[in-house]
Amino acid sequence: MRLLIHTDGAARGNPGPAGAGAILRDASDGTVLAEIAEGLGHATNNVAEWTAVLLALESAQGLGATHVDLRLDSELVARQISGVYRVRHPDLKPIHAAAMKLLRSFDGYTVGHVPRELNKDADRLSNVAIDAPTSMSPSRSPLG
């Protein structure tokens, strides 16, 4: 199964209250299979962006995906995944390593940068995660 995954991370204050959001769709028909909105406490925007990717990949693996098409509005993270830029910050290295290990476990993957206006669903989820009361976050809701 091939999934189209949109992810976004947000931090208010950078660093500040942060959240990760993702929406996973069946690439063949666009059916939403899962949404992720997870509060991250106090973090930077880049930590939130990378955490959103990692959480989405974990969910994709759990759904049995064989291929993933990642779409992010963070050009930096898209280029780090593609290997154009290196990950240098110590806070990002373990998240990056875990995400790349997961990516390599799929039969194939693509990554692309999309304009913010094409990533509204993931952006909404990352902001929901920041705004949600602690008892509501993290929330990962597979849809059926």
Task: Locate each region found by the language model.
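Short, surface-exposed, polar/charged, turn-prone segments marking secondary-structure boundaries
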Residues: 31-34, 51, 96-100, 123, ...
